């Protein structure tokens, strides 16, 4: 294992509530009901895909022009930016600071594969941006998760073969993307979204480098990786 690639939301910090509040505000303005179940469906997908999902849910997929959709996304991001500006290093999820230190101490490269265009700002607010050797810009990709491109791009930026990478996700689309990239998939959470992961932990505090090493060795044996 030469590199570990992280998703951001739900793995490094939890801004799901901020996404929920920002999307709910927009949905209410266009008379579409929006609840937490709907918000769960948006985990791991891009802003454009999220808006399309909301519009389809509300039967309004043909109601807005592209320019109007751009304005809705701009307003959502403005609300979200205001909310994330309050983040501090205290908002790191439990165990993540420790894991980053362990990875650095063993010279294992660290990458970020997040669909969020706000990822660099969030990492700066959390005071961990300097820990990352590569941060993928999702705006440069043709497809988002579950397409593997974002993880393959991270591996290329780190100059590490995908087969030598582990990646950590909390969403079904992300797990699918990791496996399609040919990487060791670590899922944070439980239930249906974690199906397909090579290792599942209930919460980030369970993540340690020792556990990753142990499960990585078992994975190599199962997959006959030299």
Swiss-Prot record:
One of its GO terms (cellular component) is cytoplasm. It catalyses: beta-D-glucose 1-phosphate = beta-D-glucose 6-phosphate. Its cofactor is Mg(2+). CDD domains: HAD_BPGM. Its EC number is 5.4.2.6. The modification 4-aspartylphosphate is found at residue 7. The keyword ATP-binding does not apply. Beta-D-glucose 6-phosphate binds at residues 9, 44-45, 47, 116-118. GO terms for molecular function: beta-phosphoglucomutase activity; magnesium ion binding. Keywords: Carbohydrate metabolism, Cytoplasm, Isomerase, Magnesium, Metal-binding, Phosphoprotein. Binds 1 magnesium ion per subunit. It is found in: Cytoplasm. Autophosphorylated. GO terms for biological process: carbohydrate metabolic process. InterPro entries: B-phosphoglucomutase_hydrolase, Beta-PGM, HAD-like_sf, HAD-SF_hydro_IA, HAD_sf, PGP-like_dom2. The keyword Transport does not apply. The active site is at residues 7, 9. Mg(2+) binds at residues 7, 9, 170. Pfam families: Hydrolase (PF00702). Belongs to the HAD-like hydrolase superfamily. CbbY/CbbZ/Gph/YieH family. Homodimer. Catalyzes the interconversion of D-glucose 1-phosphate (G1P) and D-glucose 6-phosphate (G6P), forming beta-D-glucose 1,6-(bis)phosphate (beta-G16P) as an intermediate. The catalysis proceeds via a phosphoenzyme formed by reaction of an active-site nucleophile with the cofactor glucose 1,6-diphosphate (G1,6-diP). The phosphorylated mutase binds either G1P or G6P and transfers the phosphoryl group to the C(6)OH or C(1)OH, respectively. This is Beta-phosphoglucomutase. It comes from Bacillus subtilis (strain 168).
